UniProtKB/Swiss-Prot annotation:
Belongs to the TRAFAC class TrmE-Era-EngA-EngB-Septin-like GTPase superfamily. TrmE GTPase family. Residues 221-379 form the TrmE-type G domain. It comes from the Bacteria. Gene3D superfamilies: P-loop containing nucleotide triphosphate hydrolases (3.40.50.300), Probable tRNA modification gtpase trme, domain 1 (3.30.1360.120), tRNA modification GTPase MnmE domain 2 (1.20.120.430). This is tRNA modification GTPase MnmE. It holds the Pfam family MnmE_helical. Its EC number is 3.6.-.-. Keywords: Cytoplasm, GTP-binding, Hydrolase, Magnesium, Metal-binding, Nucleotide-binding, Potassium, tRNA processing. Its cofactor is K(+). The keyword rRNA-binding does not apply. One of its GO terms (molecular function) is GTP binding. It comes from Lachnoclostridium phytofermentans (strain ATCC 700394 / DSM 18823 / ISDg). One of its GO terms (cellular component) is cytosol.
Amino acid sequence: MKTDTIAAIATGLSNAGISIVRISGDQAFAVIDKIFQTKSKAKRLSEMDSHTVHYGYIVDEEEIIDEVMVIIMRAPRSYTMEDSIEIDCHGGITVTKKVLEAVLKAGARIAEPGEFTKRAFLNGRIDLSQAEAVIDVIHANNELALKNSMKQLKGNVLHKVKDVRHSIILDTAYIEAALDDPEHISLEGFSDKLRDNVIGSIKELSELINTSENGRMIKEGIRTVILGRPNAGKSSLLNLMVGEERAIVTEIAGTTRDTIEETVFLNGLCLNLIDTAGIRETSDLVEKLGVEKSLKSAKEADLIICVIDASTPLNQDDKEILEFIKDRKAIVLLNKSDLDSVIEEEKINLLTNKPILKISAIDQTGIKDLEQTITEMFFEGNISFNDEIYITNMRHKNALVEAKVSLEQVIVSIENEMPEDFFSIDLMNAYEILGTIIGESVDEDLVNTIFKEFCMGK
């Protein structure tokens, strides 16, 4: 690991109130002493107590660059567990760059992307899953994603994985000890105990794996396709949910010929709304391509909102759409409830078992019922999180699945009365795989790949 002193701008480079230039490494105080000056020219910062804030100026050969506040943190009580300095300067682009240039001129080098967090990981302050949570916190685009990332940052995934690994290593150690010293340590009856322990570990891993689909939707949003025949009111519904005229609305059927995507936030959930071309038989080549794209989007959706014009009788297009959504997560909306309805809910019920709601995109009625129904369809209506952690990282999910497969092989070996050393092979394989999640058994290339995704200064 590189132990030289690094520096970078930790905030977005723009005209703002303040910017932060971060320094970390064993020469951090030597660097700041060269460029920081107080009005009274009092003691150097290297002589000050840790976790204190100091007012003064950043200078370059006696020329004042900026008026700043400097925070000093001595190792190991810092983010990187190294001597660290944070310079709060004015937020202009030019002045921030000049401050960084002074820091580099004084002996620091520019940090690589994610190098501060990488040092926090390599120095043992956080594990690899927590390091990955840092970037998830930064990129979180909704409240639930932020809450889940913070739980991971606090070590929830770490603790669950460590508990399973601890159980595995205890069983492995006992087997190895018994094989080395059979006169004093007996394996008689151990298979039953091992089976119970492994089944418990498989259950723990399965529970984590089963959260990954909801985890994906928390992180990326619920892919929600608005489907229906032309002029059913799909674009009006999109505009209503988005809160602005995002899609063109006319009385001419087939106005929307391509998908339109927008993101809305609903009770902490992120919905990626997709307005699609109306579904109908058509000879128009462009419209036909739009219909095909609509159906493709619907097949990939987490949720389909099927919009039916309640002011006109059901036609064959409506019936085919209802058949299409039969085995998918969907809601049926009877739109244009402001007009006289000619469709009976009982007839719709015969064609689908999906929730049916009345709505008027024009009068903006029924939207609250729609929002409540969507909330209830995901996370069992409970999105307060409590103590649950959702797996949002595909690397973590794949490792959990691989570890589970190895543990299931242990059960197979027990049932087939295989020699005990066979148990150890699969147990240790699961142990090592789980170690890749928290960084206890991971190669350098993977670590470097993960941290390259970070921004400069983090």
